[in-house]
Amino acid sequence: MVVSEKVLKWAMRFYPPLLSQRIWVQKFGKGFTSVEVKVSKSILNKNYNDSIFGGTIFAAADPFYALLFDQILQRRGFKVRVWLKSAQIQYLKPGRTNLYFKINISEEDIAEAEQILKTVGKYVKAFPIEMYDKNGQHCVSLINEVYVRNLYADEKRTIAY
């Protein structure tokens, strides 16, 4: 389903798995080529080390590459199924304050995905996510592998991935 940046921002803000973990979409860039996300430290996501629970950090990174590629490609006429295929995470420092990250998808990445979808029908690529605390300290590095494929002839589009 194609939606505006503002509508998806508010939908994601109140999506229960993100809301309950205090994961807050600050903004989607024009045309869904970027997203800025804040992970707020709270009593609901604190671990015994007084830092943000690793599962919360992982959950924060999970949906966004898939959402961005889905919205970008739908706007360009593609009928696709998109999801996160795999992820790796390295906790570099404890997240003792709020964490922040930004994802940007370049025009080159979009063009590459379009070309591969037109010729092969399936696009798989790994992308980095770096999370920083409020002081600019690098706390987390992730690699998210996005999987995009054309819908099969008899396959119906769903809201979920």
Language-model segments: what does each one mean?
Residues 1-20, 44:
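Alpha-helical membrane-targeting segments
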Residues 20, 32, 52, 64, ...:
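Short connector loops at helix/strand junctions that flank enzyme active sites
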Residues 20-52:
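Catalytic strand-loop segment that frames the active site of acyl-thioester-processing enzymes
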Residues 20-25, 85-91, 112-114:
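Short structured motifs
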Residues 35-37, 85-87, 101, 125-127, ...:
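Hydrophobic residues positioned within well-ordered beta-strands of beta-sheet architectures
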Residues 44-66, 79:
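Hot-dog-fold acyl-thioester-processing enzymes
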Residues 68-107:
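Hydrophobic beta-strand-centered segment that forms part of the acyl-chain substrate-binding groove
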Residues 95, 106-161:
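HotDog/MaoC-like acyl-thioester-processing domains
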